[in-house]
Amino acid sequence: VTAVEPSQELPMNPFRRIAVAALLATAGAVVAGAPQPAVAQAAAATPPGTVLVTGASRGIGFEFVRQYAEAGWSVIATARKPQDAKNLVELAARRRNLRLEALDVVDAASITALQQRLAGLPIDVLINNAGDTDQFRGQSFGKLAHDRFGYLMELNAHGPMRVTEALVGNVEAGRQKKILAVSSLAGSFGVQGGGMPGGYWYKASKAALNMLMLSLSQDLKPRGILVACLSPGQVDTQGYAARGITMPGMVDVKLSVEGMRNVIAGLAPAQSGTFIRYSGDVQPW
């Protein structure tokens, strides 16, 4: 199983531009641009702690790792094969506060092994980022690849729950006690009301992730743990802008992660169980 970071909010296949137009037309303020003033400086004001990021080999996950490490946090970056991720290895060589760990979020033995290695280590922030779009292959009605449904559900929805259940004790021992999942507006019932076509398996997996995190927020409330889903926006992790390819609302990965870090830093008990865009706007479930 190849686990990659969710590289964008919407697919790049033929229905891509239609989906973008529908999203912008129907979501209104939900997809408004820059981070809100209330959260703009939250990350800078938050004392460094320990953060664990899954799916950290590239894209959004790697940018989370880079920014947190540069901000002085103790960072645990996980990937299926971190030793093969050149950018992670090079960053770890420069940053003594960065620890690389092997983790396959769909492999029970891999998760248990990480749980054992991290036993007794408090984690302030757990970011479930690992996920995949499967390049939207076989996700158009009439041409559905039914054998790929289970893959995306296991990786995008079940994987984060596996990891969270294994490490919840570490988070409870941390000071900040925050669990996040990088989701997508593709999994929002409110936004999908605009008629965005195709992408069935990816949408279903992200909708499932949203419900799992919402339910988890209720179960973990008595333990003082905050849980929320994050929408990174339509992120250019593939370098489209550098190649002259533009899409409405496309956002640079650095800006997206800066915004999400601010959201995480400012997350309060009243916001647990919500779906928040990198700009600070609350999204419809």
Question: What is each PLM-predicted segment?
Answer:
Residues 132-133, 139-153, 172-221:
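Catalytic loop of short-chain dehydrogenase/reductase
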Residues 71-86:
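Conserved glycine-rich Rossmann-like NAD(P)H-binding loop of the short-chain dehydrogenase/reductase
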Residues 92-109:
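Rossmann-fold cofactor-recognition segment
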Residues 57:
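Conserved glycine-rich cofactor-binding loop
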Residues 53-54, 128, 178-187, 226-231:
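Structural signature of the Rossmann-like NAD(P)-dependent dehydrogenase/reductase core
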